[in-house]
Amino acid sequence: RPVIYAGGGIRLSGALDEFIKVVEKLGIPVVTGWNAHDVIWNTHKLYVGRPGTVGNRSGNFAVQNADLLLILGNRLNIRQVGYNWKSFAQKAYKIWVDIDPTELKKPTVQPNMSVIADLAIFLPILLKVPFVKSGEKHQRWLAWCKNRLERYPVVLPEYWLSEKINPYCFIESLFNKLKKDEVVVAANGTACVVGFQAAHLKFGQRLWTNSGCASMGYDLPAAIGASIASNKGSVICLAGDGSIMMNLQELATIAHHG
């Protein structure tokens, strides 16, 4: 019952293409962590969820029932593993691949096998390794994970019955309308948590959050940076009423530079 737990190190290493090739070669269910929302799209046949304390149920079901967890460029912070980290993926043999040896020595989750490596080097090597193709048991496991993804949706039908706008319904509607190459930058709080849970990401979309230090005020400056980096391309900024006030002066930057 293997699961790949993808982290932000995949994009940081520049090895996104190799990552997709590896998971499709192995045929292993994939879950994504903070800052790795968009390393795989929702309709991919191997995507099964986003685990963690603010993740979705299908992702947590996959991790907690896995017997092998391949952790790629993911530092497994508290939001990923929970405050009772001793119960995290208890049944799984954990192979943790990270470029930073300090992350592998934290007093929380302990790997069964530590691999200190740059994913830009590790993933191409893994691609060359021969392997036995998955059998019937593995296919049943993948089907079980996909079933949980369909059986436990984040946005429930009753959410749409509210007279006021439900943030989960809003995020689902927004991402359904976005094009496949759109960029979204989210503030801290509801903007990023609901986005992490409910965003239905398409191939090529980017979703940026400040999950590391989680400070308010990140959204507007980051959206400006994302737009400049894409030659003043279109960027959707999701800002809370408190967060946007932290850097409200950046509206002048937008007005000045157009």
Where are these regions (language model features)?
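Glycine-rich phosphate/diphosphate-binding loops that line cofactor/substrate pockets in enzymes
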Residues: 1-2, 22, 63-65, 173-180, ...
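Active-site glycine- and acidic-residue-rich loops that bind
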Residues: 8-15, 76-78, 164-167, 243-246
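Glycine-rich phosphate/diphosphate-binding loop of Rossmann-like nucleotide-binding domains
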Residues: 12-17, 21-24
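Conserved catalytic cysteine-centered active-site region
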Residues: 31-45, 200, 232
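Glycine-rich, acidic loop regions that bind phosphate or pyrophosphate groups
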Residues: 36-144
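Thiamine diphosphate
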Residues: 58-60, 65-77, 192-258
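Active-site diphosphate/adenylate-binding microenvironment
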Residues: 146-221, 226-227
